[in-house]
Amino acid sequence: MAKLSPLTLIFIAACLSRILHLTILSGLSKALPLFDTSPSLLLSSPPPALRWDAIHFASVAYNGYEYEQQVAFQPGWLAVMRLAGEGVRFIRAASVVELKDVILGGTIVANVAFVAATLVLYKLTKHIFNPTFAFLTSLLYLLPPTATPSAPYTEPIYSLLTFSGIYLLSIKRQMVLAGLCFAGATTIRSTGIFNSITLMCFAVFGDAHIFDLDPKDYCKIRKKLKPFLSAILVVAPFFMFQHYTETVFCTRELKRASTARPWCSNSPPVSYGFVQKLYWNVGPFEYWTVSQLPNFALAMPILFSSLAGVVKFFSHLVSSSQVLNHGTEEIPPPPILFELYSVHVLTMALLLFTSHTQITLRVCLGDPVVWWNAVKLGFDNVQIGEAPMGQVKVNKFGRYWIGWTVVWGAVAAVLWAGHYPPA
């Protein structure tokens, strides 16, 4: 019998994880009463996938943008859900698409995207580190501390587009295709604009390490058009959607009647910050209250590993640059990691200081650095050469991480099925 490749094993494990998780959620939703009846506003017998933000996603995908608070969500995933719903309608030979078609279609796409994202993460990690590191990263990725990969949420497809963009950029050197993937990610989540940093830095620095550049090279950057065009491609979907919201909520008729929304008088009239602040209480330090301490505690394992991983990476980056300048040997990290860790720092800062911090548990799915940090901190000898599996040992932090993701993942499934907080 032929030995299965690591990629095949990961594919099988990812598919089994989706089947198992969907089965568990289905059973739990039948056994648990809904703590909040919001899902019943859309369907009298809501499926387990219809919880929290999925309620908004399904509503907009089916009815379009009806209310101001809904423009907090980028339109990309909602369009995918609608298209998937049309596919379900076609398969069941119905004349009109129904809300349940949209929910089922979105659930299928999200689960397929999660499996695909896991495979792309393995291939990306294998090229940057080594096969053992990549295998462990993928296995940890299949133990997320959230139930959202099984639901019609933005994270799975956002992760797939982001990982694919990084892979196409750093491994295949396909800048245009990478830019399209990153732009697609921005249509899914507004944080996709951070990927413009990765693309622009790669266009400027290429395979050079940032500390190896001569000061004259920085002066040349201002004369280059390509990096800025790349960045515009990635951020364009965000501003295009803001223009759309302006045309809907800031019409001349509404302005004449003095009934236009307050943000319409801003220059430029951007709705995003206003809506996030008014309806979702998102803003600098808005979440820093005593009552939210439990939610900070939930995100602490990721925040702690992020801090430790960032300090370790940039310390290595600086020290490797210094020894190279002195002629001694120390292998510096691959150049692409500087961009990815920089984006990681921005993302974690946004989650810690501005957002609902507990969403770190699901936003982490789209950030490969989170999972690389977990492997670096949780396993010994994993970055040495090819790192044969027999030489790699799980340490105390690794056991804690695995235990935490398993236990909290199970708790999160129960909370999700019963529509219990936190979201």
From Swiss-Prot:
Superkingdom of the source species: Eukaryota
GO biological process: GPI anchor biosynthetic process
Pathway participation: Glycolipid biosynthesis; glycosylphosphatidylinositol-anchor biosynthesis
EC numbers: 2.4.1.-
Transmembrane segments annotated in the record for this chain: 7-27, 102-122, 128-148, 151-171, 191-211, 228-248, 298-318, 333-353, 400-420
Annotated GO CC locations: endoplasmic reticulum membrane; mannosyltransferase complex
Pfam (any one): Mannosyl_trans2
Keyword list, A-Z: Endoplasmic reticulum, Glycosyltransferase, GPI-anchor biosynthesis, Membrane, Transferase, Transmembrane, Transmembrane helix
Annotated membrane topology: Multi-pass membrane protein
Localisation: Endoplasmic reticulum membrane
Single GO term (MF): glycolipid mannosyltransferase activity
Function: Mannosyltransferase involved in glycosylphosphatidylinositol-anchor biosynthesis. Transfers the second mannose to the glycosylphosphatidylinositol during GPI precursor assembly.
Family label: Belongs to the PIGV family.
Protein's UniProt name: GPI mannosyltransferase 2
UniProt organism field: Cryptococcus neoformans var. neoformans serotype D (strain B-3501A) (Filobasidiella neoformans)
Gene name for this UniProt entry: GPI18
